[in-house]
Amino acid sequence: QSQLHEILWKQFSVRKYLWAEFIWCMFDFASYGRVEGDTKSQNDKGLCTRERIPKDVYFFYKSVWSSEKTVYITERRHEFRACDVPFVKVYSNADAVELCINDVSHGRISRCELPDDESTVFVWKNIKIKPGTKNKICTKAYFSDGTSRTDYAFWTGK
């Protein structure tokens, strides 16, 4: 879901004549007869679940539209992963974000290195995690006022 919204955002950002963007719905909701995903009779296009738990896409829009300091590791609920992780993606409106796996830095990406239409999507590629153990995925976001925020996830390598 968040990947679709990232693609749409790129389209919106180059069309300066658009004066507004709208989200279809904030929350997933009941929809009799609908069969999609793993839940029947539910429209699952909301930014949050029916239980009001924010999905990744919620944090994408928060990083784009809000001035509130945001840093969020995506796909965090996918806890069990192959040891070769194709990418780690973080949504943040910070000036720079650093990724650490088990307290080892995998580099800091500056916002000025990102394309304008992806200025809140930070991606590290070809990351390896240890098999059979919980790996601590940590990001630290650095903001222009000198403050920082961190986010954590734990992924177990298969």
Located regions from the model:
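Extended substrate-binding grooves/exosites of carbohydrate-active enzymes
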Residues: Q1-K136, K140-G146
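A short, sequence-level motif marking secondary-structure junctions
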Residues: C112-L114, W155-K158
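Edge beta-strands of extracellular beta-sandwich domains
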Residues: D145-G157
